[in-house]
Amino acid sequence: MSLFGTTSGFGSGGTSMFGSTTTDNHNPMKDIEVTSSPDDSIGCLSFSPPTLPGNFLIAGSWANDVRCWEVQDSGQTIPKAQQMHTGPVLDVCWSDDGSKVFTASCDKTAKMWDLNSNQAIQIAQHDAPVKTVHWIKAPNYSCVMTGSWDKTLKFWDTRSSNPMMVLQLPERCYCADVIYPMAVVATAERGLIVYQLENQPSEFRRIESPLKHQHRCVAIFKDKQNKPTGFALGSIEGRVAIHYINPPNPAKDNFTFKCHRSNGTNTSAPQDIYAVNGIAFHPVHGTLATVGSDGRFSFWDKDARTKLKTSEQLDQPISACCFNHNGNIFAYASSYDWSKGHEFYNPQKKNYIFLRNAAEELKPRNKK
């Protein structure tokens, strides 16, 4: 049974909200709702690579499942298939040819999901939850990189049950990103390590964190020649750091900016500060999106150091985001992120994934 020819439906007979005209604040930006969204908090989103015709969206959730939708040009979404872990799914990624999806879970494993056969097999094992999973495609090797709370970074040939390589981390892996030939891993206790992936993965540099609070998300950015040149790092303290690996002028080129905070500025109106839950760079313009526990997304131009847009406030945190391969679609997930503890969790509240046309809003403004 081929995934791309069928609709095996976790959404069959579903309750589509597509085209809904409700005016409540779960969708204040009036974006397109993905049908049959997960039944628990959505921790990760990833769009298919440009090698696949069309657009397919993957989401992993705290309901232990991974779901795949086809996103049509009209914005309509068709549920295609799903797979299960035995614990919450914390990260997802695609192989470069779009035939496989890799999933990382609290069940201490990572799996490889073959979308054409709709079969999933375990390819990685850790001693604690697996927080990150990335596909690495190098000229001389291909592998899956997993980062775990067991304080290791492991590299796997999907044909073998033993890792090709294990690198020790200073602390638990909290977030990571890969754009060949660079990987960056951020850990607990504000650890930050850059790896080079040419020939074989190796540690390139440990960096003193530019942020004073817990790392939450990281995304690599490219230069004008399309080479990875630095990263954006987000923390729980409503702040993002832009960090270049080899900047001409470190003191000037590297900077941090505040985001996902309420408008209060002084003691009479104290400011509420929220976690930055996700960062994604636009694949064409190099501008970036951030999403936060405040229930807003914002678009930024890091080169001009300006904010391009901030959304209205949703009635739940935004827990994850991503762009499709050509940057026309911005996907973001609205669900509880546990930032206020279990007492604020409402199991009756629905989780949503929204799709927004992002082609124009992410363009850098013309310099005057």
Curated annotation (Swiss-Prot):
Q: Which UniProt keywords apply?
A: Cell cycle, Cell division, Cytoplasm, Cytoskeleton, Mitosis, Nucleus, Phosphoprotein, Repeat, Transport, WD repeat
Top-level taxon:
Eukaryota
Where does the protein end up?
Answer: Cytoplasm; Nucleus; Cytoplasm, Cytoskeleton, Spindle pole
Which residues pair up as cystines? Answer: none
Q: Can you quote a single GO CC term?
A: nucleoplasm
Q: What GO terms in the biological process aspect are recorded for it?
A: cell division; regulation of mitotic spindle organization; RNA export from nucleus; transcription-dependent tethering of RNA polymerase II gene DNA at nuclear periphery
Organism of origin is Bos taurus (Bovine)
Q: Which protein family is it in?
A: Belongs to the WD repeat rae1 family.
Q: What does this protein do?
A: Plays a role in mitotic bipolar spindle formation. Binds mRNA. May function in nucleocytoplasmic transport and in directly or indirectly attaching cytoplasmic mRNPs to the cytoskeleton.
PANTHER family (alphabetical): MRNA EXPORT FACTOR AND BUB3
Return the protein name. Answer: mRNA export factor
Where do the segments described as Disordered lie? 15-34
Give any GO molecular function from the UniProt entry.
RNA binding
- Any Pfam family: WD40
Mark the WD repeats by their residue spans: 37-79, 84-114, 125-157, 168-206, 215-255, 271-301, 310-346
Q: Which residues carry this modification: Phosphothreonine?
A: T229
